[in-house]
């Protein structure tokens, strides 16, 4: 019994001893009695914390004592109200400690210094090749008026005002605030002309390179022409002027414009429309989860429709399905009147006004009543269309007929009129290209053709032209009038050949009959990746210029302009 009591007492002693040894020092805990402020010395950059700026720290504590400052970068101070400079940009925690009172910590974000480029002057409202000059401006926050060296790198075809070619220009900043400038510049090539500037800061004798800057100068053509837009896979919306190169001055290149607006994740379609005499591009991005998903909770949707003005200066959200059902993402569509008609993955298509902005997707694939048209609402259902048939495109002709290609649980092109929706007792008419899979699709009613990108079927794989037959007639996939074998890449995102991307959209030039499309080459394909077109007059597939971008959605603005 005595042994047990002794053991119990020993344990209590050990516990008590442990408690005493681990007791924290409460005297310097965060305290409401400790506080401080900080600001940039001087007035010019008083609201911006740059890494070359001198910061004034002021102790505003209500209680006094010995102070210690920790600036979060390995340096400290015991001054009452110190100043400090940070050598690098980043986030720092600054702590003021007053012995016996407590401490206070505030985060501070120190910014990098980035030169800002702008077009300060231009000799005409629209910058065009050869004859319109610009002058660039540069602004650099420089609190200590340190000497800066600038290296300007010009795009190919840049000249001075007198026509002298210029590739690089090196200049310096000066004590009077001026910066050496290359002067007036002209451009020989159409497209986004990217001017890059490297900036070097002299800090304590160190030749430190700051973040590089660039500006895209949009340079138009010397003649008016339509504009071809396309969605780069993993990039921005880009554009080309649709100009016959024989009409360009000698040595001029027709290069793409970077519109500065994101294409999204998987932009299978982009659609041109004019609203109140303003031209817009609608971007249908079905997101990352565009193939079959197990989405029992209906939350994996990540697609959206955005709209961009033709010049890229305006962009806005039309409708979002982020957080909705994955199968309700927007895949493809067309404009009819003042509405955009757009497909989901495999239930049907809906409508939205071309002027709507900031909407949230409400359609549910389990509720067909939330669609303008669904698979189940047509007489084709169980007569060629099975449950969950996946859509690939949507078109509408001048006779009021919808053309609705399918690629899974249905094959071919299904045609119907608005009055056929809801009538399920019989098929509206015959199925076109039955047994085939048509991915990209377009109508050319002026020349009485339609076009398909075939991914399966008896005709083979590639680009095909067919005659536009009467509504009551049918057509087999082998009855094409033109066919070109081309192997497009399935592209990442799905293991199903039915839902692979291949070529997702065609754009028909009404003036020439040429059919444009983005092509991502499969392994072993002789045609390289880029923009292609079917030359209607020549009856040949041609590479558009020297394009090499991976493009999905594509459309044409027929309005003839020098720029946009």
List PLM regions with ranges.
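Structural motif
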Residues: 235-243, 289-306, 347-353, 409-416, ...
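Short coil/turn segments that connect the beta-strands within blades of beta-propeller domains
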Residues: 225-226, 278-279, 337-338, 399-400, ...
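Surface loop/turn motifs at the tips and blade-to-blade linkers of beta-strand repeat domains
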Residues: 255-266, 318-326, 367-387, 430-436, ...
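Repeated scaffold domains used in trafficking and secretory/extracellular systems
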Residues: 265-278, 325-337, 380-395, 435-446, ...
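An edge-strand/N-cap motif at the start of beta-rich repeat modules
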Residues: 214-261, 270-273, 281
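Residue position within the beta-strands of beta-propeller blades
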Residues: 230, 282-284, 342, 404-405, ...
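Extracellular/lumenal mature domains of secreted and surface-exposed proteins
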Residues: 19-224
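Blade-level signature of beta-propeller repeat domains, shared across WD40, Kelch, NHL, RCC1
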Residues: 526-564
